Curated annotation (Swiss-Prot):
Organism this protein belongs to: Oryza sativa subsp. japonica
Function (record text): Possesses glucomannan synthase and mannan synthase activities in vitro. Mannan synthase consists of a 4-beta-mannosyltransferase activity on mannan using GDP-mannose. The beta-1,4-mannan product is the backbone for galactomannan synthesis by galactomannan galactosyltransferase. Galactomannan is a noncellulosic polysaccharides of plant cell wall.
Record membrane topology: Multi-pass membrane protein
EC annotation from Swiss-Prot or TrEMBL: 2.4.1.32
Domain of life of the organism encoding this protein: Eukaryota
Biological processes, Gene Ontology terms: cell wall organization
Gene3D superfamilies referenced in this protein's UniProt entry, alphabetically: Spore Coat Polysaccharide Biosynthesis Protein SpsA, Chain A
Record lineage: Eukaryota, Viridiplantae, Streptophyta, Embryophyta, Tracheophyta
Record's keyword annotation contains Magnesium: no
Keywords: Cell wall biogenesis/degradation, Glycosyltransferase, Golgi apparatus, Membrane, Transferase, Transmembrane, Transmembrane helix
Keyword Membrane: yes
Protein name listed in UniProt: Glucomannan 4-beta-mannosyltransferase 1
Localization per record: Golgi apparatus membrane
Length: 521
């Protein structure tokens, strides 16, 4: 009894002995580092806000900066020879719900049929789905579309491997440009007529990237949150990068490449899970320019289940960090681009947007600030924990004005997702076990509507409690709630208001009540 009592009594004493010489200095250092990263992120956001304002005021649209005359189609002497031969690649993997949408949209493009080659690169492992896709390709081939259905013996290199394999065919040598669409993307008929002229009339342009438009943005609150983040990416980040230095990350789909630029850059590589970004950086280091067309929009689908969204965010966060690790010295040693472009790629593109933005969000707002509740000697200035994040949040709202009223929920959800993004970023930087893990984002198409309309399926829609739980989120929620109660009882800064709301957000995600729930078949 004396031992137990002594041990219990010794805990506060041990804490007080460790607190002053160890905990306080370490926490102050962590606060200083996080404040520095917050300032860097704030300056980056302000820089983009100023530039995008200038772009809009000065009307620096792509059609004003580059020649983009329409390709003539009324010359009887030239006929269709005025149109370059374009290759369309549609990579897919077990895309039962959406394969018809992308194939149908691509086959409906307004382009001479003898100047268009469509490749369906099917890596599906389900033989039933493979047969369905093959039949769909045959159906369009019978209508006169030059479409080929191609499979591989293995999935080596995943999407990059499929695209690389598709470029090896002899007929590709006749193609000047290649457009890529993921299986859930549906380009409008005039897509090529609005993008190809930029490549035809400007020999230094390698890539034309279109904007994504989300057909299921109103599916649930989670898809609205995604729309807000991605709209900011397209309307601000891509627009600014295109206008300032003609460089940005290829989004992997809804874009058109000059084939010669792809070949000069070394083609598709599967060394990371962001083969699109990899190719874009290598092409940029060769001196090629990119153009972003915000007024050309391609319909696509957002992941509406939390599991699919989480896997997607892991790939999108881990891949860039891993690519940064592998390409840093290659960028530094490059002789073809200016020092300012190198700084933009290393600092703005990689360090701030792909690494610091993820890490500071989780470390500062979900760990460090709550931890200071227990160590009142460590103070955080209001400009660091209130003003800067508020301004950054407001700046993010410009991409989706219709969702301005959801900003409060958006920032809470972004903080929750920063847990996974930070973890993925560190895995990529350290090139740990899951650094090259590729999980195809689940697309539901109309499946959810069809299943939910069935009463028999509705009875099976309830998942087992254990399958819904996200233990890590529940752990963070417990930590935040503990900090909140302690602050409510002993604190003076009213941090408990934020801590309770943020803890509730982690708890809701932790018990699986976010996104849509797909009824079991």
């Amino acid at each position: 009894m004396e031992v137990n009592g002594g041990g219990a009594a010794g805990l506060p004493e041990a804490w007080s002995q460790v607190r002053a010489p160890v905990i306080v200095p370490l926490l102050r250092l962590a606060v200083a580092v996080c404040l520095t990263m917050s300032v860097l992120l704030f300056l980056e956001r302000m820089y983009m806000a100023v530039v995008i304002s200038g772009v809009k005021i000065l009307r620096r649209r792509p059609d004003r900066r580059y020649r983009c005359d329409p390709i003539p189609d009324d010359d009887p002497e030239l006929g269709t020879s005025a149109f370059p031969v374009v290759l369309i690649q549609i990579p897919m993997f077990n895309e039962r719900e959406v394969y018809q949408l992308s194939i149908g949209a691509v086959c409906g493009l307004s382009w001479p049929s003898d100047r268009l080659v469509v490749q369906v690169l099917d890596d599906s492992t389900d033989p039933v789905i493979k047969e369905m896709v093959r039949i769909e390709c045959e159906r369009w081939a019978h209508k006169g579309v030059n479409i080929t259905y191609q499979i591989r013996e293995n999935r080596k290199g995943y999407k990059a491997g499929a695209l690389k394999e598709g470029m090896k065919h002899g007929y590709v040598r006749e193609c000047e440009y290649v457009a890529i669409f993921d299986a859930d993307f549906q380009p409008d008929p005039d897509f090529l007529r609005r993008t190809i002229p930029f490549l035809v009339h400007n020999s230094d342009i390698a890539l034309v990237q279109a904007r994504w438009r989300f057909v299921n943005a109103d599916e649930c609150l989670m898809t609205r949150m995604q729309e807000m983040s991605l709209d900011y990416h397209f309307t601000v980040e891509q627009e600014v990068s295109s206008s300032v230095c003609a460089f940005f990350g290829f989004n992997g789909t809804a874009g058109v490449w000059r084939v010669s630029a792809v070949n000069e850059a070394g083609g598709w590589k599967d060394r990371t899970t962001v083969e699109d970004m990899d190719l874009a950086i290598r092409a940029s280091l060769k001196g090629w320019k990119f153009v972003y067309l915000g007024d050309v929009q391609v319909k696509s689908e957002l992941p509406s289940t939390f599991k699919a969204f989480r896997f997607q965010q892991h790939r999108w966060s881990c891949g860039p960090a891993n690519l940064f690790r592998k390409m840093l010295m290659e960028i530094v040693r490059n002789k073809k681009v200016t020092i300012w472009k190198k700084i933009h790629v290393i600092y703005n593109f990689f360090l701030i947007r792909k690494i610091i933005a993820h890490i500071v969000t989780f470390a500062f707002y979900c760990l460090i600030i709550p931890a200071t509740i227990f160590v009142p000697e460590v103070r955080i200035p209001k400009w660091g924990c209130v003003y800067i994040p508020t301004i950054i949040t407001l700046l993010n709202s410009v991409g989706t004005p219709r969702s301005f009223h959801l900003l409060f929920f958006w920032i809470l959800f972004e903080n929750v997702m920063s847990l996974h993004r930070t973890k993925a970023t560190l895995i990529g930087l350290l090139e740990a076990g899951r650094a090259n893990e590729w999980v195809v984002t689940e697309k539901l198409g109309n499946a959810l509507k069809m299943k939910s309309s069935s009463k028999s399926s509705a009875k099976k829609s309830f998942m087992r409690v254990w399958d819904r739980l996200n233990v890590t989120e529940l752990g963070v929620a417990a930590f935040l709630f503990s900090c909140g109660w302690y602050d409510l009882a002993f604190g003076k800064d009213h941090f408990f208001i934020y801590l309770f709301f943020q803890g509730a957000a982690f708890f809701i995600v932790g018990i699986g009540y976010v996104g849509t729930i797909v009824p079991q078949s």
